[in-house]
Regions:
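Catalytic active-site module of serine/aspartate enzymes centered on a nucleophile-bearing elbow/loop
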Residues: 77-121
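Conserved serine/cysteine hydrolase catalytic core
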Residues: 6-84
Length: 121
């Protein structure tokens, strides 16, 4: 994980947090339940009208992955498909790419709070 694009204070805080015992334990727990989460997610057939934005990190994404992302967007009648010229990692540690991911989260939360459909950007 690279912290180079973060402002100095944020970079220092992120580095300090990521090396704590609780952060490491959380990561281990996340990996431990990943298979169960994947099984539950694969059994999901509909989100009905719940807001959903499928944000695809296009760098390195092959046609099969794109197809799976298209399918995921069909789970809700209130969904958008967005593309980022990014990698999965850069959606977290690159300031511009993280802003794209943050905007998608913001848009979903706003749609939930206002009970309004997602608006295309």
């Amino acid at each position: 994980f690279s912290y180079t694009s973060l402002p100095p204070r944020s970079r220092d805080e992120a580095r300090a947090k990521s090396s704590t015992a609780s952060s490491i334990a959380s990561s281990i727990e996340e990996y431990g339940v990943a298979n169960t989460s994947m099984q539950q997610a694969s059994a999901l057939t509909s989100l009905n009208g719940k807001p959903l934005i499928v944000l695809t990190a296009d760098e390195g994404a092959d046609d099969q992955w794109q197809s799976k992302q298209d399918h995921m967007a069909t789970l809700s009648t209130n969904s958008l498909r967005r593309h980022a010229n990014a990698t999965h990692q850069s959606l977290l540690d690159d300031e511009a790419d993280a802003a794209v991911a943050s905007q998608a989260i913001h848009d979903v939360v706003s749609a939930v709070r206002t009970s309004q459909p997602l608006a295309a950007r």
